[in-house]
Curated annotation (Swiss-Prot):
It comes from Actinobacillus succinogenes (strain ATCC 55618 / DSM 22257 / CCUG 43843 / 130Z). Its EC number is 2.1.1.189. This is 23S rRNA (uracil(747)-C(5))-methyltransferase RlmC. The active site is at residue 342. One of its GO terms (biological process) is rRNA base methylation. The lineage of its organism: Bacteria, Pseudomonadati, Pseudomonadota, Gammaproteobacteria, Pasteurellales. PROSITE patterns: SAM_MT_RNA_M5U, TRMA_1, TRMA_2. The keyword S-adenosyl-L-methionine applies. The gene is rlmC. It comes from the Bacteria. GO terms for molecular function: 4 iron, 4 sulfur cluster binding; iron ion binding; rRNA (uridine-C5-)-methyltransferase activity. [4Fe-4S] cluster binds at residues 3, 11, 14, 89. Belongs to the class I-like SAM-binding methyltransferase superfamily. RNA M5U methyltransferase family. RlmC subfamily.
Length: 383
């Protein structure tokens, strides 16, 4: 991938950019192997890594806003502590550059003065732009210091929608603190539509403001599709999807299992109410029965259940599932575990704690090309 920003060192976020892509995959695979090297791999099948496109793969741009209201700069504060314009970043869909040009004009028309950190003055802190690969519609979020400019934004919104016809969801997020915090709790919708629909392997998934959603949709689709293929023929009647987010894993697995056994039951648990709303909407759109999603802490939910599932899916944050939940799963003894991780180091530690389980399949997913980060999926069975 050719990147002028990396060549001039104005942005070095893609730290592996000079490493050939095949070598990137080899290094990541080696790192993954090191994390599980002391575990029993006698029955483990290694599936070849799921590769990513090397450019244009991100569906979301998070832009720090600097400069002036007449000449805003959308991008990052780089390691030289300078604002860098990244509107033509090659990780984004090609059309984002043109959209950002329109947004710069909107910033001026709505009087959205970029927030000045040193002076603690101004209004506009970030612009967040997300695209649905399924239908090319867009979600646009303005992170503001206050609600002062909302009347002007509403006045100019019709003109913005004319220039960007795919604009489906527009919000103002209010983040009043003078701190390096991306977003505040208050989200004000400026459009009637409040969710962006994405579709992976025929399963509709919904993106909401403040909800987590994978930023590499092609690889995310591969991740969910692999999970679906691994479990579709397993003898599963009940499954839990802990840390379920918008329901990607649970819905893919439940849809495949219910195709063979209609009364398969899914329970999804996620601490974010916004994500649970999206997951429930997806289940309804899919026409799936015996599905429930609850807004709870996943570990606490599991520790307080009496019924026993046949399959437990865990997709924890970077810290992993931790010893209490691992020990609970050892004692609960579901026949199958499906573990998805964005941090192979903590996953390796968790798998050491899951002493009653043995890895059967594993696959690396290159969700973040040109960096050291990756996702991994492994299927475990009860010993």
């Amino acid at each position: 991938m050719n990147c002028p920003h990396y060549q001039t060192q104005t942005c070095i976020s893609c730290r592996w950019l000079e490493t050939p892509y095949a070598d990137q995959l080899t290094q990541k695979q080696t790192h993954l192997q090191q994390q599980i090297s002391i575990l029993d791999q006698s029955r483990l099948e290694w599936i070849p890594p799921f590769q990513s496109a090397q450019s244009g793969f991100r569906n979301k741009a998070k832009m720090v806003v600097n400069g002036t209201v007449e000449r805003p700069i959308l991008g990052i504060i780089n390691e030289r502590n300078q604002p860098a314009d990244l509107t033509d970043c090659p990780l984004y869909p090609a059309r984002f550059a043109e959209i950002f040009s329109v947004l710069k004009d909107f910033i001026g028309r709505a009087g959205l003065v970029p927030y000045n950190i040193a002076k603690q003055k101004g209004e506009l802190k970030y612009i967040l732009l997300t695209e649905s690969r399924a239908n090319q519609t867009l979600m646009l979020r303005f992170v503001l210091r206050s609600e002062t400019k909302l009347p002007l934004m509403r006045r100019e919104l019709a003109g913005l929608s004319t220039k960007i016809p795919d604009l489906a969801v527009v919000t103002a997020n209010i983040q009043p603190q003078h701190a390096a915090i991306l977003e505040g709790q208050k989200e004000i919708f400026l459009t009637e539509q409040q969710v962006l629909e994405e579709r992976f392997n025929g399963i509709p998934l919904f993106i909401r403001p403040q909800g987590f959603f994978q930023t590499n949709p092609a690889v995310a689709e591969g991740l969910y599709g692999t999970a679906q293929n691994w479990v579709k023929n397993l003898p599963v009647q009940r499954l839990w999807d802990l840390f379920c987010g918008v329901g990607g894993f649970g819905l893919h697995c439940a849809a495949a299992l219910q195709a063979n056994t209609p009364d398969v039951a899914l329970t999804g648990i996620e601490i974010s109410p916004s994500a649970i709303y999206s997951a429930a909407l997806s289940a309804e759109k899919c026409g799936l029965k015996n599905v429930s999603f609850q807004s709870l802490d996943a570990a606490n939910f599991a520790l307080n259940q009496d019924d026993k599932p046949d399959l437990v899916i865990v997709n924890p944050p970077r810290r992993g599932i931790g010893k209490p939940l691992a020990e609970f799963l050892n004692n609960l003894r579901p026949q199958f575990l499906l573990y998805s991780s964005c941090n192979a180091v903590t996953m390796g530690s968790d798998l050491q704690s899951l002493t009653h389980y043995q890895m059967r399949k594993i696959r690396l997913f290159d969700m973040f090309p040109h960096t050291a980060h990756y996702e991994v999926l492994t299927l475990l069975t009860l010993k």
